[in-house]
Amino acid sequence: MQLKSQEMRKLAPELDPLRIGTGWKKEDLGKVQVMVESTYGDSHPGSGHLNILVEEVRKGIAEEGGFGARYHCTDICDGESQGTDGINYSLASREMIANMIEIHANATPFDAGVYLSSCDKGVPGNLMGLARVNIPSVFVPGGTMNAGPEMLTLEQLGMYSAKFERGEIDEEKLDWAKCNACPSCGACSFIGTASTMQIMAEALGLALPGTALMPSTSPDLLAFAREAGRQAVRIAQMENMRPSDIVTMDNFENAILVHAAISGSTNCLLHLPAIAHEFGIEITGDTFDRLHRNARYLLDVRPAGRWPAECFYYAGGVPAIMEEIKEHLHLDVMTVTGKTLGENLEELKNNGFYEKCEKWLQEFNKRYNVNLTKEDIIRPYDKAIGTDGSIAILRGNLAPEGAVIKHTACPKEMFKSVLRARPFDSEEECLDAVLKHKVQKGDAVFIRYEGPKGSGMPEMFYTSEAISSDKELGKSIALITDGRFSGASTGPVIGHCSPEAVDGGPIALVEEGDLIEIDVMERKLNIIGIAGERKSMEEIDEILAERRKNWKPREAKYKKGVLRLFSQHAASPMKGAYLEY
């Protein structure tokens, strides 16, 4: 087959000398040319080691007769920007990463691509860009960091910080936690957004089998990176191996069933629909709700479970999860191996993959003096932790387009409740009220004007952690927002409330003392009373209509720059909050 790179060499005589000036040799010019795009940078632990993996990818490309060119667009860290205005840039950065991949790939001719990232916005940004560019491609997950001493992992820092603020621990204990929570590179060691999205990449068939959430310190990760380079060259010379040839609605349904099994981050409801949109496939919150109902929740890993994320790989990773839910999966979907999902799963049973995982698990047991088995981490299908998936889409007069709750991380006491509304127009005000004990048992705390168009849709992590780490509030109040939550968040938190406040959604009309009904099993989120008194739904509709007459749209928060662009063009959270032009 004719390679795009070689056709462009004929049209652009300056291309060869420019390549040579960049370090290519003359004999490299006629090879399969592969763009190796990563989020490498000193931005955070998930990207700091990717340059090492990039070089392994390039070695694999060379071994298969190709040449790999390095491109970088680093990502930001939600953890580093948490609690500051910097977090407002997080979701917008996903769009910019995808845009830079489009620019890099289309401004210069390439025959294939390999993409490397680890974390919250890097992985979905890579997958969106990969779909948009649509050249034969392989994604390489950057792996997970190890847990620290006492199995300390980063999501526990919010709890430590809240305890320190309340005077429950001293500064020395807080400092110990800070110095030991991130002992290596890789994604944070819990099933937050970073880990979830690595798993989604593999579940979609865009990464090599068994590569998601490998420990970043493992030599196996280097070997898989090299194999990804080889595979990119192979599929560049095959017919019908572009991402659009591989990924269908069936692939996305597989991924969502895996999401249910791992109790994945709610941010996946922003990212999978945005990735699907690039493939011309429509996925909404309703798709998640439909597939999560009656799905098995199997993974006993933090934040909803007990163990660090590295244990996920030691128990067999994505393939082990898929084996447990195999009867519900589309096994005939294609993957980047050039084989179907079913063929990949059978091959892993015979190539020593699971035996190697077991060896790593035994080393983990020695390190922490525990005695875990695979079944302690990934439950068998018939011994599932839960049988109703892990998330639910709630609807009602408070969220006509929907809102999301991760019910596996929510106390059962809060599944059906009526609470008093306490609205705040910023997270800072709300967090201050929680820490100063101005929020009481039975309150429904609202943080609004924090949606995509309002402020960029930041995470409400500190507030959610302050609530969930309080023994009384964590089981007696709810946090409802048009913003989003960290993948590490636990407790009675409801996000993505749509339409958002800045668009005049009902969340903007909530007043102090309104009665709020939450019913997770019936998927309801309603205002059912005013000033502490129950009203009929007809009366509520009339009152909200009257309030709307007095509501005034807010002036745009951002006047220029990236956030101005994002706030003007972001789609609804229920669609994925991607840029609509």
Predicted regions and their residues:
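Acidic/charged coordination and interface sites in well-structured regions
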Residues: 52
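Glycine-/small-residue-enriched capping loops at alpha/beta junctions
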Residues: 49
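Glycine-rich, highly charged phosphate/nucleotide-binding loops
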Residues: 90-99
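Catalytic or ion-coupling anion/metal-binding cores of large enzyme and transporter domains
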Residues: 1-46, 55-73, 79, 85-90, ...
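A short, small-residue-rich loop immediately preceding and capping a beta-strand
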Residues: 105-126, 138-141
